Regions:
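Short beta-strand segments enriched in small/hydrophobic residues
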Residues: 17-20, 54-68, 174-182
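Short gly/ser/thr-rich secondary-structure transition/capping motifs
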Residues: 42-48, 101-102, 120-123, 250
Length: 254
């Protein structure tokens, strides 16, 4: 792998001059800049984002903390963010927390150590006060504990309402909502609330169930679904909070 010394040797310029080009510091002639750019391309030199950050207050590194990447939502999210950061000349530092608060706190410290210029956070465990005390900007995705942090969120409650209205409109009268994790605050909780609101308004039988954390971690709900259908044979409509759950409902039911 090429180094800054190789670029210096290729161009005949000092390492200091090459470094100034990389960091866009001081006066650099167009000829010098083009010479360095040509050498970088020829040598396929990849500047180390962290090394470049050592002389600055921050880097061109963005941190991303997700609970896991086995779930399609997070794997798709990761792919999209990675593409966006790469296209804009940023590096992405990914952490998988498994939803553990201690792990997430350690990952925040790693972000500090690596001088990230920003963090994308998928966690419901950090209060706005904790987020505001960080020295870099934070964007929360689908998890905004007290509703005050900068966040990108779906209207999950409306999604739950639409699901209930669709099932009831199809003639279903004994509904089950399978959404949310026991003991954890999740976006799916709002879907269950919206689902319940419509069921009460329409006066249909329903039950809202959450599932143990270990099922979410394993992404295997088949035993739970089988038990629900066995214990509630009258069930004629199920609201699944994710595509994974929906596919496993179809697998068990048919």
């Amino acid at each position: 792998m090429a180094t800054i010394k190789d670029v210096s040797k290729e161009t005949g310029l000092s390492i200091g001059t090459v470094s100034r080009v990389f960091n866009n510091r001081g006066y650099i002639s167009q000829e010098t800049r083009e010479k360095v750019e040509a050498a970088v391309k020829k040598l396929n030199y990849q500047p180390n984002a962290l090394a470049r950050s050592l002389s600055k207050s921050s880097s061109r590194i963005i941190g991303l903390i997700v609970p896991h990447i086995a779930h399609p939502f997070f794997s798709d999210l990761l792919a999209s963010i990675e593409n966006a950061t790469r296209e804009r000349g940023y590096a992405l530092m990914v952490f998988v927390s498994k939803g553990e608060e201690k792990s997430e706190a350690e990952m925040i410290n790693r972000c500090r150590e690596n001088r990230v210029c920003g963090l994308i956070l998928c966690s419901g465990r950090f209060s706005t006060q904790k987020i505001e005390n960080l020295e870099f900007p934070v964007v929360c995705i689908e998890r905004n504990p007290d509703g005050a942090a900068f966040a990108i969120e779906c209207n999950n409650r409306q999604g739950g309402r639409l699901a209930a209205e669709e099932l009831i409109g199809k003639g279903c009268r004994n509904l089950v909502s399978l959404a949310g994790i026991q003991g954890r605050k999740m976006p799916a909780d709002e879907r269950s609330i919206g689902f319940e609101e419509v069921c009460r308004e329409k006066k249909v039988n329903f039950i809202c169930l959450s599932y143990p954390p270990e099922l979410y971690d394993r992404l295997d709900y088949t035993a739970l679904i089988d038990r629900i259908l066995t214990e509630r044979p009258e069930t004629d409509g199920i609201f699944a909070s994710s595509d994974i759950i929906a596919s496993q409902v179809l697998q068990v039911a048919f």
